């Protein structure tokens, strides 16, 4: 795999996650979040000539990192459509699925993408640049209650209603188009000592809404449950409590709500058994080298 001219994304918990896939040389594997290709490259290094890796990413920029390898197929699509493409390629079952749910460093550091409050640019935040709705569309068209719900649910912000009210009032004077426009509206609502943390939560909430991240994750997790062979591994790296809760629930109970199904006799039916009872986190050395790994949590489960 050729190195990108600039570092697209430093893979987090690389060895821990790929080890967790329990790779067999001739297996069929899925990297649901290709990004800079770091995890895919490591997976390919452990496969023989009969194996195959299907890697998904909806961002056209990720295509610049793909590898020319007969054992590799790149699918430019959101991982929520995983079953459609596995069916298309005639794949009846896979041996492991890996998903690193973190936003690539590339996205945060590219001012044109609008993911970070550190740079001026358009308020965009689309992972898929061909998708219709931008963050600017959300803040300019959603009603006050809907905005408040987004900030409360996806950003866990206590002042979500004040935020929504300020946005609606400001857009009545002029449209909020750029990150600068947006910061001008919301910055006064936060104390200086917690400003960066609160702004990060606001931007997280908008990003989740724009990209429908929770809905996509839900669909992918249920699809993975069906796609994995018995003994197959589901390996997921999460970065915030909302997605981690969903992943934990699906692995423990087979249901994102955390309610395990029971058979006629009341016996609990769960599709997975946990490989690691406690989450795996980045060590001090990795956190020092890559601070964005600090919030990463790795969970691994095996299909019964």
Curated annotation (Swiss-Prot):
Gene Ontology cellular component annotations, sorted alphabetically: cytoplasm
Keyword annotations: Cytoplasm, Methyltransferase, rRNA processing, S-adenosyl-L-methionine, Transferase
A GO molecular function held by the record: rRNA (cytosine-N4-)-methyltransferase activity
SUPFAM superfamilies noted in UniProt: Putative methyltransferase TM0872, insert domain (SSF81799), S-adenosyl-L-methionine-dependent methyltransferases (SSF53335)
Top-level class of the enzyme under EC nomenclature: transferase
UniProt keyword Transmembrane present: no
Alphabetized Pfam families for the sequence: Methyltransf_5 (PF01795)
Chief location bin: cytoplasm
GO biological process: rRNA base methylation
Subcellular location: Cytoplasm
Sequence positions that bind S-adenosyl-L-methionine: 37-39, 57, 79, 100, 107
Catalytic activity of the protein: cytidine(1402) in 16S rRNA + S-adenosyl-L-methionine = N(4)-methylcytidine(1402) in 16S rRNA + S-adenosyl-L-homocysteine + H(+)
Its EC number(s): 2.1.1.199
PANTHER family: 12S RRNA N4-METHYLCYTIDINE METHYLTRANSFERASE, S-ADENOSYL-METHYLTRANSFERASE MRAW
Role, per record: Specifically methylates the N4 position of cytidine in position 1402 (C1402) of 16S rRNA.
HAMAP family: 16SrRNA_methyltr_H
Family: Belongs to the methyltransferase superfamily. RsmH family.
Classification via NCBIfam families: 16S rRNA (cytosine(1402)-N(4))-methyltransferase RsmH
Protein's name in the database: Ribosomal RNA small subunit methyltransferase H
């Amino acid at each position: 795999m050729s190195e990108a001219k600039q570092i697209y994304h430093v893979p987090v918990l690389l060895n821990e996650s790929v080890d967790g896939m329990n790779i067999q040389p001739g297996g069929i594997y899925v990297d649901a979040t290709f990004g800079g290709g770091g995890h895919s490259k490591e997976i390919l290094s452990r496969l023989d000539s009969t194996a195959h890796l299907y890697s998904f990413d909806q961002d056209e920029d990720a295509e610049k990192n793909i590898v020319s390898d007969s054992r590799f197929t790149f699918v430019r699509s959101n991982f929520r459509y995983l079953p459609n493409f596995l069916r298309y390629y005639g794949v009846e079952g896979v041996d492991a699925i890996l998903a690193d749910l973190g936003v690539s460093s590339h996205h945060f550091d590219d001012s044109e993408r609008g993911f970070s409050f550190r740079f001026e640019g358009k308020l965009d935040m689309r992972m898929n640049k061909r998708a219709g709705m931008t963050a600017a569309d959300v803040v300019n068209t959603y009603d006050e209650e809907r905005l408040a719900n987004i900030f409360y649910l996806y950003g866990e912000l206590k002042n979500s209603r004040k935020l929504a009210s300020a946005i609606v009032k400001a857009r009545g004077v002029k449209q909020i188009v750029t990150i600068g426009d947006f910061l001008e509206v919301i910055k006064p609502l936060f104390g200086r000592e917690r400003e960066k943390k609160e702004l990060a939560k606001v931007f997280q909430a908008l990003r989740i809404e724009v990209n429908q991240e929770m809905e996509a994750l839900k669909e992918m997790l249920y699809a993975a449950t069906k796609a994995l062979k018995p003994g197959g591994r589901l390996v997921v790296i999460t970065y915030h409590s909302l997605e981690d809760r969903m992943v934990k629930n699906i692995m423990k109970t087979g249901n994102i709500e955390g309610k395990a199904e029971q058979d006629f006799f009341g016996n609990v039916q769960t599709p997975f058994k946990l490989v690691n009872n406690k989450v795996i986190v980045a060590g001090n050395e990795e956190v020092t080298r890559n601070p964005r790994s600090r919030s990463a949590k790795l969970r691994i489960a095996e299909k019964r």
